[in-house]
Amino acid sequence: MQPPGRAPTQGRTLIALFEGQQYPVTKEEFVIGRGQKTSDLTIRDSNVSRRHACVVLYNGQYWIVDQQSTNGVEFNGGKVDRKVIEDGDLYRICDHEIQFVYR
């Protein structure tokens, strides 16, 4: 059993769910943005920065980190600069929702 507030990363894969697609996070820096060549998860929207946010692995936990984007990353109605990703978390980037699950 995981202590409260800890993402269950050990032995499980983090999956980003976006527009019916699954994007496994399989590296230490997973880029979310508008840039097709520079992003692991591409959002085609001019309001999304080329390199909008990253998912990074730090001390055994995945974090979502805003990359000083123009429009930010929202969680539970408020903007976040960085946050530990927990199972089921739902983030908004402009008008787009990305949910993260561990499998």
Indicate where each model-derived feature is located:
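Short, ordered coil/turn segments that flank beta-strands lining enzyme active or ligand-binding pockets
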Residues: F18, Y58, T70, F75
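C-terminal boundary/linker segments immediately following FHA domains
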Residues: Q68, E74-R103
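Intrinsically disordered, low-complexity acidic Ser/Thr-rich regulatory segments
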Residues: M1-S46, V56, H96-Y102
